[in-house]
């Protein structure tokens, strides 16, 4: 299980970069919408259904990355991905996704008004077709600005 500080750092993010690879070794990295953290699982939304989706169908290993801009510590989360595109679990996250979509849209509107930020689109739209990427966290790598790495099995 990941520690509380890392969990909170992940939960504060809206998007996270996911890297995948096809069987010939061709890499692909793309931002994914972070839906939730539950136990040792991250739930991401893939609404493009392109190379990431294709890669994960044949090679379900992925690496996620992000940086804490306050500490400049980078994180890499490695694990196995299950594509959830039907069934009770899929239907169960639809409500959570709709709620998060509303919260994010409200936040963007408030920021736009109070900070004078301009957004081309304040509302976050979730397309009709999407899949959930359920990532089982297996390893967390912490990369410090000093160049030191700390690897931990989850």
Positions of PLM-derived features:
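N-terminal structural module
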Residues: 1-47
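A generic local secondary-structure boundary/capping motif
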Residues: 5-7, 53, 120-125
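Short, surface-exposed beta-edge/turn micro-motifs
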Residues: 13-16, 40-41, 59-62, 130-132
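Short, structured patches in soluble enzyme cores that scaffold and shape functional sites
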Residues: 20, 66-68, 135-139
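Histidine- and/or cysteine-centered catalytic micro-motif in compact active-site loops
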Residues: 21-23, 32, 47-49, 67-69, ...
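A short mixed-secondary-structure module that forms the rim of ligand-binding clefts
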Residues: 34-72
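Charged, gly/pro-rich active-site loop segments
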Residues: 74-154
């Amino acid at each position: 299980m990941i520690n509380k500080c890392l969990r909170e750092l992940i939960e504060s993010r809206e998007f996270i970069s996911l890297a995948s690879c096809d069987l010939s070794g061709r890499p692909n990295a793309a931002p994914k919408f972070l839906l939730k953290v539950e136990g040792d699982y991250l739930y991401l939304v893939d609404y493009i259904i392109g190379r990431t989706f294709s890669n994960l169908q044949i090679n379900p290993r992925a690496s996620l990355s992000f940086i804490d801009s306050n500490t400049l510590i980078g994180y890499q989360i490695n694990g196995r991905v299950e594509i959830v595109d039907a069934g009770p679990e899929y239907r169960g996250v639809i409500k959570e996704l709709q709620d998060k979509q509303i919260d994010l849209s409200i936040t963007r509107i408030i920021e736009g008004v109070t900070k004078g930020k301009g957004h081309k689109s304040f509302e976050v739209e979730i397309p009709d077709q999407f899949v959930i990427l359920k990532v089982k966290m297996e390893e967390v790598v912490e990369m410090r600005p000093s160049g030191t790495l700390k690897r931990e099995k989850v």
